[in-house]
Amino acid sequence: MTNKSVRDYIRTIVDFPHEGILFRDVTTLFADPRGFRIAIDQLLAPYAGMRFDKVAGLEARGFILGGAVAHQLSTGFVPIRKKGKLPGRTVSVSYQLEYGEAVVKVHDDAIQAGERILLVDDLLATGGTAEAGIRLIEQLGGEVVGCAFVVDLPDLGGRKKLEAMGMEVHALCAFEGL
């Protein structure tokens, strides 16, 4: 049997969601038990020996990855959700999209001051959602000690944005272009 890399499990869909876009579909990675296991192990590898209090995942595919990572680390999991999806008391951060604005929220008691958080998502593009998630965590007094992604789209500048914030960024693979 050949050794497949995480990248080999990711399907590319042309012209989705708009013409000219190459959509990197990680659902094929999630559907394959071996590929999913490899991805979780590789997401955790750079953090061996580090202590985390919680893992935060960005909606929606970050929930799948973040939940699995939190399980492996024996930590809690914090969902960072889109506006209108969390009941109860929340804090929010807005961020700019190409055309407009979006909001992410987290429960106001999800993270305690001083907790060490690993932020996880499937894909790093412009970094806007990840930056908003980091700001939410910091607003609650948490410390983001790592940002882990399956896919980095370096041409869109997200890694540079997060590194400029002082974040350690780990991605399993990169795809050039849009």
Swiss-Prot record:
Intracellular or extracellular location(s): Cytoplasm
The protein's Enzyme Commission number: 2.4.2.7
Keywords (A to Z) from UniProt: Cytoplasm, Glycosyltransferase, Purine salvage, Transferase
UniProt-recorded Gene Ontology molecular function terms: adenine binding; adenine phosphoribosyltransferase activity; AMP binding
GO terms under biological process: adenine salvage; AMP salvage; purine ribonucleoside salvage
Keyword Coiled coil found: no
Pathway: Purine metabolism; AMP biosynthesis via salvage pathway; AMP from adenine: step 1/1
Reactions mediated catalytically: AMP + diphosphate = 5-phospho-alpha-D-ribose 1-diphosphate + adenine
One GO CC annotation: cytoplasm
Enzyme class: transferase
Gene3D superfamilies in the cross-refs: 3.40.50.2020
Family: Belongs to the purine/pyrimidine phosphoribosyltransferase family.
Self-association and partners: Homodimer.
Reported function: Catalyzes a salvage reaction resulting in the formation of AMP, that is energically less costly than de novo synthesis.
Protein known as: Adenine phosphoribosyltransferase
Organism listed in the record: Cereibacter sphaeroides (strain ATCC 17025 / ATH 2.4.3)
Lineage: Bacteria, Pseudomonadati, Pseudomonadota, Alphaproteobacteria, Rhodobacterales
